[in-house]
Amino acid sequence: MEAARCAPGPRGDSAFDDETLRLRQLKLDNQRALLEKKQRKKRLEPLMVQPNPEARLRRLKPRGSEEHTPLVDPQMPRSDVILHGIDGPAAFLKPEAQDLESKPQVLSVGSPAPEEGTEGSADGESPEETAPKPDLQEILQKHGILSSVNYDEEPDKEEDEGGNLSSPSARSEESAAASQKAASETGASGVTAQQGDAQLGEVENLEDFAYSPAPRGVTVKCKVTRDKKGMDRGLFPTYYMHLEREENRKIFLLAGRKRKKSKTSNYLVSTDPTDLSREGESYIGKLRSNLMGTKFTVYDHGVNPVKAQGLVEKAHTRQELAAICYETNVLGFKGPRKMSVIIPGMNMNHERIPFRPRNEHESLLSKWQNKSMENLIELHNKAPVWNDDTQSYVLNFHGRVTQASVKNFQIVHGNDPDYIVMQFGRVADDVFTLDYNYPLCALQAFAIGLSSFDSKLACE
């Protein structure tokens, strides 16, 4: 009788189970809310590489063919080029690297955009640089300023100080002149874009276009979109690369997606957005990583020489088109990542020299690690400059990048750090701009962009 009295009834068990389920669901909801809050906070992380809206738009002028020579014939660096910090963001961790000669230009509220022709320097700082700046973003946008950091010129501090003491009428006249100048620069950039489209011509054969280096003096402007459809079924996102043309037209170039059931990251690239299999006729190359996910190699659609020794001609064995190396980031440093890109050299006809290693010891990565760089070109990401005013690393993307992200980067050559070989950056949640120049081709540039998406130790 006592045992029956002490035993809990079915109603008590049900209430206890309901309470347990309610608490578990509450914990799951709290964890989901914390995760979403963390992702939003990470997106707004101030230490991410971002375009700084506080510097005036630089004039974009087409480069002459002689300015591209460092990528063809090696030469000594110019004496007037400042090479501080070009080896990556690690230089910013050292105290002696704080005194960089290239500084971001800060536009004070109330002062007009400085003219290009006037240069000035002052020992004292402008008083308005430390003053609060309400609605700074709107004021800068009225001046037509969309990107940041002037790497070529010193900040015009004297001009800023003079603007603080000038009369309102003088300020209005200078503002009008700056607006006219911005309009003329916009028109010039539009003419340059039309000339670039004319030199590129129509893309008739996607495979030939993907393998061919960009024309000298022409910036190929593309957009990369990420399609997350199917991720709920265990599929990886699909990435599409489109060529931007005038009048908001775009032409499909490449598509890529990560393979399933692979020990390492393997991205297959195709010229057919509906067929991303390796057996498809449109398969043109792949991007493969090492086990750590810090080194990547780009191949064309040729045959692996190890698997087909003596069975195929040398002309059909695969080429290595590029190697991408990320410096391992294990200390939690949330600043820009350091990356190196190795590509085959170019001959005197501006064509890529075929690079067909027979084994791993002859690969691009092995030659780069052994410093055997004959007929090879080494590129690296341009080190961003820390801006105390915005508390972030900034690069001048010329208005092509609008959102902060650790994936934003520019690639340059050591002998000419002002010549942007490639730049990549976020403009929306799943939209990125990808612009590349000679000597890169579309497949190389797309693969470099894909490597930055991979969830690797160097990117965390």
UniProtKB/Swiss-Prot annotation:
It comes from Mus musculus. Residues 151-162 have a biased composition (Acidic residues). This is Tubby-related protein 3. Keywords: Cell membrane, Cell projection, Cilium, Cytoplasm, Developmental protein, Membrane, Nucleus, Secreted. It comes from the Eukaryota. Disruption phenotype: Failure of neural tube closure and death by embryonic day 14.5. Failure of cranial neural tube closure coincident with increased neuroepithelial apoptosis specifically in the hindbrain and the caudal neural tube. In addition, the number of tubulin beta-3 positive cells is significantly decreased in the embryonic hindbrain. Morphological defects in the embryonic craniofacial regions, the spinal neural tube and the limbs. Disulfide bonds: none annotated. It is found in: Nucleus; Cell membrane; Cell projection, Cilium; Cytoplasm. Residues 166-188 have a biased composition (Low complexity). The gene is Tulp3.
